[in-house]
Amino acid sequence: RRQRQMCIRDSYWNPVWGEYNRVRNHYNEMTVTLEQPETGRILNIRFRLFDDGLGFRYELPLQRNMNYLTVKDELTEFNLTGNHKAFCIPGDYDTNEFAYTTAPISEIAADMERRIARKSYESKAEGGLTVQTPLMLKSEDGVYLNISQTRRG
């Protein structure tokens, strides 16, 4: 069973510090609610579309008969349209102490392996293909893309 809910928000907020003293918070939002028929478990996927970007998150609302949940895997993927220039560091669970790589997506693994080998880091990117977020990309026509994640709690 699926449900969809939509809303528009247009408000302002005041940051504690930064370049601006007032920031506009304007977006269209759609929440898709998915229900697993066998268990009745519910998952919400909330999308927010801004003038300059898109955000989404998975939400597990408080539910009967579900005291805890173990997330075994997270398989979100992005299907990019080109071999964009990437600005990134290797993905590592215990350090951010890497030099940044600037290379086309197709060459990230090779470039990172060369850099890691020269510096003799203890931790290496898993398979040479994992990158740390945020991942900043630049398309051939000059559009910047930023793939990031946040954690609440």
Regions found by a protein language model. Name each.
Residues 23, 36, 41-153:
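Catalytic and substrate-binding clefts that recognize carbohydrates or anionic sugar/phosphate headgroups
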Residues 24-33:
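Short, hydrophobic/aromatic-rich segments at coil-to-beta transitions
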Residues 3-8:
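Short, small-residue-biased leader/transition segments that mark boundaries at the very start
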Residues 9-17, 42:
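Charged, amphipathic alpha-helical segments
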